Amino acid sequence: MAGKQPPPLMKKHSQTDLVSRLKTRKILGVGGEDDDGEVHRSKISQVLGNEIKFAVREPLGLRVWQFLSAMLFSSVAIMALALPDQLYDAVFDGAEVTSKTPIRLYGGALLSISLIMWNALYTAEKVIIRWTLLTEACYFGVQSLVVTATLAETGLMSLGTVLLLASRLLFVIVSIYYYYQVGRKPKKV
């Protein structure tokens, strides 16, 4: 039994060798084009990524806007949690607060959103930045509708509420602007 020899190695034909190499490269995804038309030279460049390709070209003022938004959400949340009467009075000049619980729940929800805003400030991922900006725009849009409906019901109109509505609409416009700017395809260099 010790005298039995293994079968001789067979040589591959050049055509099947090329097909095999092509299949291997296709499985690994090396050499082909990705969705953006980039051709990867090696698997390492695919895994590590191309910095130019993955770098987000941030619009001017985006990080400042994110910081201001996070500060705004945090400060209003803290005010709603700690001083619900004063917040309600600032929005609806002189109206009586019937219950503090809804205002405090509003503050808790805003605090949760502000945590998302603070985390988005430190990320470079386009998707997270865009979702945060969309969340902001939706929040300010819904808040504008709610304040408008409340003013229509109560009939109380003051300079403070008009300024609040104008600022909320401005925030919606700025958030949507940055949302679309971050989502644009980068120009090929």
Swiss-Prot record:
<keyword id="KW-0472">Membrane</keyword>
<feature type="transmembrane region" description="Helical">
    <location>
        <begin position="156"/>
        <end position="176"/>
    </location>
</feature>
<feature type="topological domain" description="Extracellular">
    <location>
        <begin position="152"/>
        <end position="155"/>
    </location>
</feature>
<keyword id="KW-0597">Phosphoprotein</keyword>
<keyword id="KW-1133">Transmembrane helix</keyword>
<feature type="topological domain" description="Cytoplasmic">
    <location>
        <begin position="177"/>
        <end position="189"/>
    </location>
</feature>
<feature type="transmembrane region" description="Helical">
    <location>
        <begin position="64"/>
        <end position="84"/>
    </location>
</feature>
<feature type="transmembrane region" description="Helical">
    <location>
        <begin position="131"/>
        <end position="151"/>
    </location>
</feature>
<protein>
    <recommendedName>
        <fullName>Tumor protein p53-inducible protein 11</fullName>
    </recommendedName>
</protein>
<feature type="modified residue" description="Phosphoserine">
    <location>
        <position position="14"/>
    </location>
</feature>
<feature type="transmembrane region" description="Helical">
    <location>
        <begin position="109"/>
        <end position="129"/>
    </location>
</feature>
<dbReference type="InterPro" id="IPR028266">
    <property type="entry name" value="TP53I11"/>
</dbReference>
<feature type="topological domain" description="Extracellular">
    <location>
        <begin position="85"/>
        <end position="108"/>
    </location>
</feature>
<dbReference type="GO" id="GO:0016020">
    <property type="term" value="C:membrane"/>
</dbReference>
<keyword id="KW-0812">Transmembrane</keyword>
<dbReference type="Pfam" id="PF14936">
    <property type="entry name" value="p53-inducible11"/>
</dbReference>
<feature type="topological domain" description="Cytoplasmic">
    <location>
        <position position="130"/>
    </location>
</feature>
<feature type="topological domain" description="Cytoplasmic">
    <location>
        <begin position="1"/>
        <end position="63"/>
    </location>
</feature>
